[in-house]
Amino acid sequence: MKAKFYICNHCGNLVTTIHNAGVPLVCCGEKMKELVPNTVEASGEKHLPVAELSGSRLTVTVGAVEHTMADVHYIQWIFVETENGGQIRYLNPGQAPSTVFELGSEKPVAVYAYCNLHGLWMTKL
């Protein structure tokens, strides 16, 4: 199942689904908006995840030019989608915009990064 992410336009809640039953996701009394990766007008070189697979270890860095990690502008999380599911890592201001995923026998399909100002970014693998 392809990963999909949704946001509440009122409170900012972000969710993903484990099973999509086909009914709209609702928050604050309104339908949540699906986030479409790579559609915000911003620098791709600072937002697109860069992934390097070495054996079962996937290293992901956000941006060919490293993304800032300031209190007001940073990457909140990185998600790796695999053939059988996925893993997420949460980041904080001041940390490097990178993480390592141990995938075991899982095959990575795509990596996503979420910028608090410029939204969702994705690189297919």
Question: What is the meaning of each model-derived region?
Answer:
Residues 97-101:
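Short strand-edge motifs at loop-to-beta-strand transitions and within beta-strands
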Residues 5, 24, 112:
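Residues immediately within or flanking Cys/His clusters that coordinate Zn2+
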Residues 8-11, 27, 115:
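Short cysteine-rich clusters marking metal-coordination/redox-active sites
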Residues 62-70:
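Short amphipathic, basic-aromatic surface patches that mediate peripheral association
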Residues 17-21, 35-38, 123-125:
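Short Cys/His-rich "knuckle" micro-motifs
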Residues 107-117:
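Short, aromatic- and glycine-rich surface loops/edge beta-strands on solvent-exposed regions
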